C-alpha cells in the first residue's frame, strides 16, 4: 500500500464517486481510470437469497423536499431520514447494524460502541430511538448509507436512490 498526497478538490471528487459502503479509494480509482477489460483481483461474496422484505408504509409521504429544506445542516437531514425509516420499520431496523465498512462501524445500539471503533466517528442518536450512527462522513457517503439502509429494509434500488436524492439533491442533478 502506498500513500499519495492529493489536492482537496480531487479528494472531494473521488469521495463523491463512492457507490457503496466500504468502497476504498483504490476501488473508486480503479473503477474511474482502468479500462473495463482490465483484470483486477477481486472476490465477490454471494449474498444468500432471502425472502424479499416489503417496506412498511409510504416513506415518501413522510419525507418531503420541503420538510428536509427546514434542516440546513446535512447531518440533520441525514438523521431525519434515518429517524423516519426507524419509526416506520421498528424491529426490522436492527438490520442496519449489519452495515459496516472494511474497518468502520456505521450503526450501533449505543454511543460507546461507535466511539470504541474510532474516536472520530462523531456519533449521533437517530431520533428518539436506541440507534446511533457515525456522522463524520462526507455527504456522498451519507447518501450511500441511506441507499444501503433502504436496501436492507426492503426498498428497491430506485426508491433507495430517491431517498438519497431527497437527502442531497445536488449529488443527483444532471
Swiss-Prot record:
UniProt entry tagged with the keyword DNA damage: no
Major localisation: cytoplasm
GO terms of molecular function: DNA binding
Family the UniProt entry places it in: Belongs to the SeqA family.
Organism domain of life: Bacteria
Localization per Swiss-Prot or TrEMBL: Cytoplasm
GO BP annotations listed: negative regulation of DNA-templated DNA replication initiation; regulation of DNA-templated transcription
Protein name: Negative modulator of initiation of replication
SUBUNIT field: Homodimer. Polymerizes to form helical filaments.
HAMAP family with a match to the protein in the record: SeqA (MF_00908)
Function recorded in the entry: Negative regulator of replication initiation, which contributes to regulation of DNA replication and ensures that replication initiation occurs exactly once per chromosome per cell cycle. Binds to pairs of hemimethylated GATC sequences in the oriC region, thus preventing assembly of replication proteins and re-initiation at newly replicated origins. Repression is relieved when the region becomes fully methylated.
Keywords of this entry: Cytoplasm, DNA replication inhibitor, DNA-binding
One cellular component term from this protein's GO annotations in UniProt: cytoplasm
Keyword Transmembrane: no
Organism from which the protein derives: Pseudoalteromonas atlantica (strain T6c / ATCC BAA-1087)
Signal peptide: none
Record Pfam families: SeqA, SeqA_N
Amino acid at each position: 500500500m502506498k500513500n499519495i498526497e492529493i489536492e482537496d478538490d480531487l479528494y472531494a471528487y473521488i469521495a463523491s464517486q463512492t457507490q457503496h459502503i466500504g468502497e476504498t479509494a483504490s476501488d473508486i480509482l480503479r473503477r474511474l481510470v482502468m479500462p473495463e477489460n482490465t483484470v483486477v483481483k477481486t472476490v465477490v461474496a454471494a449474498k444468500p437469497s432471502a425472502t424479499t422484505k416489503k417496506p412498511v408504509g409510504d416513506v415518501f409521504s413522510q419525507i418531503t423536499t420541503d420538510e428536509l429544506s427546514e434542516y440546513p445542516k446535512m447531518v440533520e437531514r441525514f438523521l431525519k431520514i434515518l429517524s423516519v425509516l426507524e419509526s416506520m420499520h421498528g424491529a426490522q431496523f436492527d438490520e442496519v447494524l449489519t452495515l459496516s465498512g472494511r474497518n468502520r462501524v456505521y450503526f450501533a445500539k449505543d454511543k460507546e460502541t461507535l466511539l470504541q471503533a474510532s474516536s472520530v466517528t462523531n456519533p449521533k442518536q437517530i431520533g428518539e430511538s436506541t440507534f446511533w450512527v457515525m456522522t463524520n462522513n462526507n455527504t456522498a457517503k451519507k447518501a450511500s448509507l441511506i441507499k444501503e439502509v433502504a436496501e436492507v429494509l426492503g426498498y428497491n434500488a430506485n426508491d433507495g436512490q430517491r431517498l438519497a436524492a431527497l437527502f442531497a439533491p445536488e449529488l443527483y442533478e444532471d
